[in-house]
Amino acid sequence: MLKNRIIGIFLLLLLLASCRQKEEVICYGTPTNDLMKLLDEEGYQLRIYPSVHEALQKAPKQAGVLLLSKSYPREGVKLDEADQKIIKEKSLRVFMEFPQCVGTTEWVTTDTLELERIVVCDSLNSLLPSMSLLSFQRCIMKQTPNPVANPLLVAAKVAGFNEAVYGLKDTPTQPILYFHNDRLLLSATCMSNFAESRYLPEQRVKALFEYIFNGC
């Protein structure tokens, strides 16, 4: 199931070899980022590097790496072919948000979400069942240049307050969180500034991050 796959990827991503143990987290991003502040407050050891390439070079083998947007919404994060080679050779697990390019593939088209809601495509936990809804208010997203199979979160105009009551059949969707490949998980928008961007409802946003960090 996608649920089990997400648990495994995110736990490795965030270096949570034990859910009861605070670990070192390799990061590219801004220390004032909401996610960075949350991890710091929770006692994680943040290793923040000035470039994507250096973060990947310094990461231990099989480590998790966070590549967070420094320039949202002006510019996305860039991952070149040399970086991809490092990820593969070191078996890294990478979360990257607001992509500008991955290798030779570019994300050039942006869109601002207006009436769309964020829909959970597969049950994550008791607060985030399949078809449950979140609101990423007026977030700016990068439209993927290629089709995405089995996205974890999508943006869509749906009926319902807490859940998409009619599902997603015949409804246009835009991928928000999805796997680019087995080593790289992409967010089409800046998820890490969840507080500043007022992602709602808070309880579900909190449940999403608790699931990511403590899902084992």
Where are these regions (language model features)?
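Sec-dependent N-terminal signal peptides
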Residues: 6-15
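Helical hinge/lid and interdomain linker segments adjacent to catalytic or ligand-binding clefts
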Residues: 23-106
